[in-house]
Amino acid sequence: MTFKWNVHYTGSKGNSVSIYTNQFNILVDAGKPYKFIEPLLYEKHFLIFTHRHGDHFKPAVYKKIRENFPNIKILANEEVSNLMFEKTKIPADVVFSDNFQFQIGTMKFTTIQNYHGAGEELVDCHGLIIEDIESGEVLLYATDLSTTIDYQEYLDKNSLQVDYFLLESNYDPQVIEFYESTKAHTGFDIFSNGSYRHLSSTEHKEFTEKYCKPDSIVVPLHQSETYSTFEGLIKRTKKDENRLTMEEVEEWKKSKNK
């Protein structure tokens, strides 16, 4: 196995993932307090920040990393690097854009744009693909995205299939549809107020099935505690006046199939 990884934290409460290759080691994001991030920084060559949201980048944590781990090279897109300079006066070592590439030994690293938000809320966000050009193994890392179109374009253009998917699977559209059909729903537009910025479980499944190899490994990231499963939704509403039950879910499913 060319790649190893450790998903330390994923989700709206903080994100940080280690990726190990036979040429270099990367920490992706540092979206937790420093005491949680510091143990993850040893033996890392690069730290890449995917975007500016607080569950991925914290200026105070970034400043302490710079002070205590000066040999780690920091990679960030222009929006994040500008925020780094604004808050700490220290920009990223490498400022990248879409399809930025570098190669160390047999490892080829490419940044891919993530669509995360829309209109004025659009955030400059990136994921990555790492290819071992010797073994042919491919790792894909992406979270906080609403579509995989740019990944599909890159994989198709380069005739690649993926060995290791570290990919967001945030919500199940059926769970949201069911919740919005019940009296427990408050009228809050779940999709428009956040879910549209993330990848659904159905899109996750379609994409991974299309680009997987026979023995690919798929690791779902950033799964919503409430909206990724019916069980999560039921748990979320168990203390509400109009709490939901699995019996109601089954009745709703039957009504949809009529």
Language model: regions and residue ranges:
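Short, charged/polar "capping" segments at the starts of alpha-helices
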Residues: 36, 79-86, 175, 226-230
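Glycine/small-residue-rich loop that forms an oxyanion/phosphate-binding "nest" at active or ligand-binding sites
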Residues: 58-59, 64-121
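Catalytic core of the metallo-beta-lactamase
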Residues: 100-168
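Conserved beta-strand hairpin/beta-sheet module of binuclear metal-dependent hydrolase folds
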Residues: 1-40, 124-144, 164
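Cap/insert and terminal regions of metallo-dependent hydrolase folds
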Residues: 152-252
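Active-site metal-binding motif and surrounding structural segment of the metallo-beta-lactamase
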Residues: 33-79, 161-163
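Extended recognition/assembly regions associated with phosphoester-bond processing machinery
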Residues: 2-8, 16, 62, 142, ...
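Active-site metal-binding loops of divalent metal-dependent hydrolases
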Residues: 10, 30-32, 52, 79, ...
